[in-house]
Protein backbone atom coordinates (compact mmCIF):
# COMPACT_ATOMS: atom_id res chain seq x y z
CA UNK A 1 0.00 0.00 0.00
CA UNK A 2 1.11 3.54 -0.79
CA UNK A 3 -0.33 6.14 1.55
CA UNK A 4 -0.29 9.92 1.19
CA UNK A 5 -1.62 12.66 3.46
CA UNK A 6 -3.46 15.38 1.55
CA UNK A 7 -5.09 16.96 4.59
CA UNK A 8 -4.23 16.63 8.28
CA UNK A 9 -5.91 19.65 9.88
CA UNK A 10 -9.14 19.58 11.88
CA UNK A 11 -12.28 21.72 11.81
CA UNK A 12 -11.36 24.36 9.23
CA UNK A 13 -8.64 24.90 6.60
CA UNK A 14 -5.80 26.84 8.21
CA UNK A 15 -3.41 28.36 5.66
CA UNK A 16 -0.53 30.57 6.72
CA UNK A 17 3.13 30.74 7.61
CA UNK A 18 2.61 28.94 10.93
CA UNK A 19 1.13 25.79 9.35
CA UNK A 20 3.33 25.29 6.28
CA UNK A 21 5.21 22.25 7.61
CA UNK A 22 2.30 20.09 8.76
CA UNK A 23 -0.35 21.58 6.53
CA UNK A 24 -3.57 23.53 6.68
CA UNK A 25 -5.94 21.38 4.61
CA UNK A 26 -8.60 19.31 6.33
CA UNK A 27 -8.82 15.53 6.44
CA UNK A 28 -8.02 13.55 3.30
CA UNK A 29 -5.79 10.49 2.85
CA UNK A 30 -5.15 8.43 -0.28
CA UNK A 31 -4.28 4.74 -0.18
CA UNK A 32 -3.13 3.07 -3.37
CA UNK A 33 -3.42 -0.69 -3.12
CA UNK A 34 -2.22 -3.17 -5.73
CA UNK A 35 -5.10 -2.37 -8.07
CA UNK A 36 -7.31 0.27 -6.49
CA UNK A 37 -7.43 3.76 -5.02
CA UNK A 38 -9.06 4.21 -1.62
CA UNK A 39 -9.71 7.69 -0.21
CA UNK A 40 -10.32 8.28 3.49
CA UNK A 41 -12.46 11.39 3.99
CA UNK A 42 -12.97 14.31 1.64
CA UNK A 43 -11.84 17.46 3.41
CA UNK A 44 -10.22 20.37 1.60
CA UNK A 45 -7.15 18.24 0.87
CA UNK A 46 -9.25 16.36 -1.69
CA UNK A 47 -8.84 19.26 -4.12
CA UNK A 48 -5.08 18.63 -4.24
CA UNK A 49 -5.61 14.89 -4.64
CA UNK A 50 -7.90 15.55 -7.59
CA UNK A 51 -5.27 17.72 -9.25
CA UNK A 52 -2.64 15.01 -8.77
CA UNK A 53 -4.91 12.39 -10.31
CA UNK A 54 -5.52 14.59 -13.34
CA UNK A 55 -1.81 15.38 -13.78
CA UNK A 56 -0.96 11.69 -13.62
CA UNK A 57 -3.36 10.90 -16.44
CA UNK A 58 -6.02 9.26 -14.29
CA UNK A 59 -9.69 10.13 -13.96
CA UNK A 60 -10.08 11.43 -17.51
CA UNK A 61 -13.31 9.61 -18.27
CA UNK A 62 -12.74 6.04 -17.15
CA UNK A 63 -11.43 6.55 -13.63
CA UNK A 64 -12.73 4.90 -10.50
CA UNK A 65 -12.00 4.98 -6.77
CA UNK A 66 -13.67 4.27 -3.43
CA UNK A 67 -14.30 6.84 -0.68
CA UNK A 68 -14.75 5.90 2.97
CA UNK A 69 -16.21 8.69 5.11
CA UNK A 70 -15.57 8.74 8.85
CA UNK A 71 -18.57 11.05 9.27
CA UNK A 72 -20.19 14.01 7.57
CA UNK A 73 -19.05 17.02 9.55
CA UNK A 74 -18.07 19.77 7.14
CA UNK A 75 -14.30 19.41 7.43
CA UNK A 76 -14.60 15.83 6.16
CA UNK A 77 -16.77 16.51 3.10
CA UNK A 78 -15.95 20.07 2.00
CA UNK A 79 -13.53 18.97 -0.72
CA UNK A 80 -16.17 17.23 -2.84
CA UNK A 81 -17.32 20.39 -4.71
CA UNK A 82 -13.68 21.10 -5.66
CA UNK A 83 -12.75 17.54 -6.72
CA UNK A 84 -12.02 18.01 -10.42
CA UNK A 85 -12.49 14.32 -11.45
CA UNK A 86 -16.12 14.56 -10.31
CA UNK A 87 -16.77 16.98 -13.17
CA UNK A 88 -15.75 14.48 -15.85
CA UNK A 89 -18.38 12.20 -17.33
CA UNK A 90 -17.40 8.54 -17.28
CA UNK A 91 -15.56 8.65 -13.96
CA UNK A 92 -17.27 6.71 -11.17
CA UNK A 93 -16.94 6.80 -7.42
CA UNK A 94 -18.16 4.46 -4.70
CA UNK A 95 -19.06 6.25 -1.47
CA UNK A 96 -19.13 4.27 1.78
CA UNK A 97 -20.16 5.55 5.18
CA UNK A 98 -22.42 5.07 8.15
CA UNK A 99 -25.93 6.45 7.58
CA UNK A 100 -26.45 9.65 9.55
CA UNK A 101 -29.12 9.46 12.23
CA UNK A 102 -31.09 12.18 10.47
CA UNK A 103 -30.35 11.74 6.77
CA UNK A 104 -28.32 9.84 4.18
CA UNK A 105 -24.78 10.56 3.00
CA UNK A 106 -26.17 11.43 -0.43
CA UNK A 107 -28.57 13.97 1.07
CA UNK A 108 -25.79 15.56 3.13
CA UNK A 109 -23.60 16.03 0.05
CA UNK A 110 -26.54 17.38 -1.93
CA UNK A 111 -27.34 19.86 0.83
CA UNK A 112 -23.72 21.03 0.90
CA UNK A 113 -24.03 21.96 -2.78
CA UNK A 114 -27.48 23.49 -2.62
CA UNK A 115 -27.63 26.32 -5.15
CA UNK A 116 -27.59 28.92 -2.37
CA UNK A 117 -24.26 27.48 -1.15
CA UNK A 118 -22.46 26.55 -4.36
CA UNK A 119 -22.99 27.23 -8.08
CA UNK A 120 -22.96 23.54 -9.10
CA UNK A 121 -25.42 21.24 -7.38
CA UNK A 122 -24.25 17.76 -6.44
CA UNK A 123 -26.79 16.12 -8.74
CA UNK A 124 -25.42 18.09 -11.71
CA UNK A 125 -21.86 16.78 -11.39
CA UNK A 126 -21.26 14.60 -14.48
CA UNK A 127 -19.47 11.69 -12.79
CA UNK A 128 -21.34 8.66 -11.44
CA UNK A 129 -21.70 8.23 -7.67
CA UNK A 130 -22.69 4.97 -5.98
CA UNK A 131 -23.66 5.03 -2.29
CA UNK A 132 -23.41 2.19 0.23
CA UNK A 133 -24.32 2.43 3.90
CA UNK A 134 -22.16 0.60 6.43
CA UNK A 135 -23.14 -1.00 9.72
CA UNK A 136 -20.86 -1.32 12.72
CA UNK A 137 -18.32 -4.06 12.03
CA UNK A 138 -18.97 -4.35 8.28
CA UNK A 139 -16.07 -5.36 6.04
CA UNK A 140 -15.87 -4.28 2.39
CA UNK A 141 -13.55 -5.95 -0.10
CA UNK A 142 -11.97 -3.56 -2.61
CA UNK A 143 -9.79 -5.60 -4.95
CA UNK A 144 -6.97 -7.08 -2.87
CA UNK A 145 -7.79 -4.94 0.20
CA UNK A 146 -10.33 -5.32 2.98
CA UNK A 147 -11.76 -2.31 4.82
CA UNK A 148 -13.51 -2.81 8.15
CA UNK A 149 -15.52 -0.06 9.84
CA UNK A 150 -16.09 0.30 13.56
CA UNK A 151 -18.34 2.86 15.23
CA UNK A 152 -16.61 5.10 17.79
CA UNK A 153 -17.53 8.08 19.97
CA UNK A 154 -18.18 11.50 18.42
CA UNK A 155 -21.17 13.87 18.35
CA UNK A 156 -23.41 12.56 15.56
CA UNK A 157 -21.40 9.34 15.30
CA UNK A 158 -18.14 8.40 13.59
CA UNK A 159 -16.55 5.36 11.95
CA UNK A 160 -12.93 4.27 12.26
CA UNK A 161 -11.52 2.13 9.46
CA UNK A 162 -8.94 -0.62 9.22
CA UNK A 163 -7.48 -1.03 5.73
CA UNK A 164 -5.67 -4.33 5.25
CA UNK A 165 -3.82 -5.78 2.27
CA UNK A 166 -1.36 -8.67 2.08
CA UNK A 167 -0.67 -8.74 5.79
CA UNK A 168 -0.17 -4.97 6.14
CA UNK A 169 -2.72 -2.79 7.91
CA UNK A 170 -3.40 0.83 8.73
CA UNK A 171 -6.13 2.09 11.07
CA UNK A 172 -7.76 5.51 10.66
CA UNK A 173 -9.46 6.80 13.82
CA UNK A 174 -10.13 10.51 13.55
CA UNK A 175 -12.73 12.55 15.47
CA UNK A 176 -13.02 10.11 18.34
CA UNK A 177 -13.12 10.76 22.06
CA UNK A 178 -11.88 8.44 24.78
CA UNK A 179 -13.92 9.83 27.69
CA UNK A 180 -12.81 8.28 31.00
CA UNK A 181 -12.07 4.74 29.85
CA UNK A 182 -10.19 2.86 27.14
CA UNK A 183 -12.22 2.39 23.97
CA UNK A 184 -11.92 -1.37 23.60
CA UNK A 185 -13.68 -1.27 20.23
CA UNK A 186 -10.76 0.71 18.84
CA UNK A 187 -8.24 -1.58 20.55
CA UNK A 188 -9.89 -4.54 18.82
CA UNK A 189 -9.88 -2.79 15.44
CA UNK A 190 -6.23 -1.75 15.79
CA UNK A 191 -4.91 -5.09 17.08
CA UNK A 192 -1.47 -5.71 15.57
CA UNK A 193 -1.79 -2.90 12.99
CA UNK A 194 1.28 -1.39 11.38
CA UNK A 195 0.03 2.19 11.84
CA UNK A 196 -2.66 3.92 13.91
CA UNK A 197 -3.73 7.36 12.65
CA UNK A 198 -5.42 8.95 15.65
CA UNK A 199 -7.22 12.16 16.56
CA UNK A 200 -4.84 14.30 18.65
CA UNK A 201 -6.72 17.57 18.39
CA UNK A 202 -5.93 18.56 21.98
CA UNK A 203 -3.00 18.34 24.34
CA UNK A 204 -3.90 16.52 27.57
CA UNK A 205 -3.84 19.87 29.39
CA UNK A 206 -6.20 21.49 26.88
CA UNK A 207 -8.60 18.59 27.09
CA UNK A 208 -8.82 18.67 30.88
CA UNK A 209 -8.39 22.34 31.77
CA UNK A 210 -10.38 24.01 29.01
CA UNK A 211 -13.49 21.90 29.53
CA UNK A 212 -13.39 20.26 26.12
CA UNK A 213 -14.75 16.97 27.36
CA UNK A 214 -17.61 15.96 25.08
CA UNK A 215 -16.30 17.82 22.03
CA UNK A 216 -15.51 14.53 20.29
CA UNK A 217 -11.71 14.72 20.14
CA UNK A 218 -8.77 13.17 21.94
CA UNK A 219 -5.09 13.48 22.89
CA UNK A 220 -1.77 11.80 22.10
CA UNK A 221 -1.70 10.25 25.58
CA UNK A 222 -4.95 8.40 24.97
CA UNK A 223 -3.88 7.35 21.48
CA UNK A 224 -0.65 5.90 22.80
CA UNK A 225 -2.60 3.89 25.37
CA UNK A 226 -4.45 2.27 22.47
CA UNK A 227 -1.20 1.73 20.56
CA UNK A 228 0.41 -0.10 23.47
CA UNK A 229 -2.67 -2.17 24.31
CA UNK A 230 -3.24 -3.17 20.68
CA UNK A 231 0.41 -3.78 19.82
CA UNK A 232 0.50 -1.19 17.02
CA UNK A 233 3.92 -0.55 15.50
CA UNK A 234 3.66 3.16 14.57
CA UNK A 235 1.57 6.10 15.81
CA UNK A 236 0.51 9.06 13.65
CA UNK A 237 -1.03 12.12 15.33
CA UNK A 238 -3.79 13.59 13.15
CA UNK A 239 -6.59 16.21 13.04
CA UNK A 240 -4.36 19.08 14.18
CA UNK A 241 -6.18 21.88 15.97
CA UNK A 242 -6.45 25.08 13.85
CA UNK A 243 -4.85 27.01 16.73
CA UNK A 244 -1.78 24.77 16.82
CA UNK A 245 1.19 26.11 14.86
CA UNK A 246 3.97 23.90 13.50
CA UNK A 247 6.19 24.89 16.43
CA UNK A 248 3.44 24.14 18.94
CA UNK A 249 2.78 20.71 17.42
CA UNK A 250 6.44 19.77 17.67
CA UNK A 251 6.97 21.07 21.19
CA UNK A 252 3.67 20.23 22.87
CA UNK A 253 2.68 17.03 21.04
CA UNK A 254 5.60 15.40 19.23
CA UNK A 255 8.26 15.74 21.95
CA UNK A 256 6.16 14.38 24.83
CA UNK A 257 4.58 11.70 22.63
CA UNK A 258 8.00 10.33 21.65
CA UNK A 259 8.89 9.99 25.32
CA UNK A 260 5.88 7.72 25.78
CA UNK A 261 6.19 5.90 22.44
CA UNK A 262 9.32 6.59 20.35
CA UNK A 263 7.73 5.61 17.03
CA UNK A 264 5.30 8.55 17.16
CA UNK A 265 4.94 11.03 14.29
CA UNK A 266 2.92 14.09 13.36
CA UNK A 267 0.84 13.50 10.24
CA UNK A 268 2.12 15.95 7.64
CA UNK A 269 0.38 17.17 4.50
CA UNK A 270 2.28 15.83 1.49
CA UNK A 271 3.90 12.96 3.41
CA UNK A 272 3.94 9.84 1.27
CA UNK A 273 5.08 6.41 2.46
CA UNK A 274 4.66 2.73 1.70
CA UNK A 275 3.63 -0.32 3.70
Positions of the model-derived regions?
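Active-site flanking residues adjacent to catalytic metal/cofactor-binding acidic residues
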Residues: 40, 70, 174, 198-200, ...
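Cap/insert and terminal regions of metallo-dependent hydrolase folds
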Residues: 178-269
Amino acid sequence: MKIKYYGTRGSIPTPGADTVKYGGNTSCISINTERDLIILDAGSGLRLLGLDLMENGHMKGDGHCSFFFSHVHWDHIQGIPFFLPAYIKGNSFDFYGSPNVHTSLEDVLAHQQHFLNFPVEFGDMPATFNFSGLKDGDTVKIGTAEITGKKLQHPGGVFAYRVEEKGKSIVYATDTEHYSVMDWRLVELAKGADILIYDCNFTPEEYESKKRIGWGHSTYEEGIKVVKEAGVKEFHMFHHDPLHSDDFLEKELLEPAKKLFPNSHLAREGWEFEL
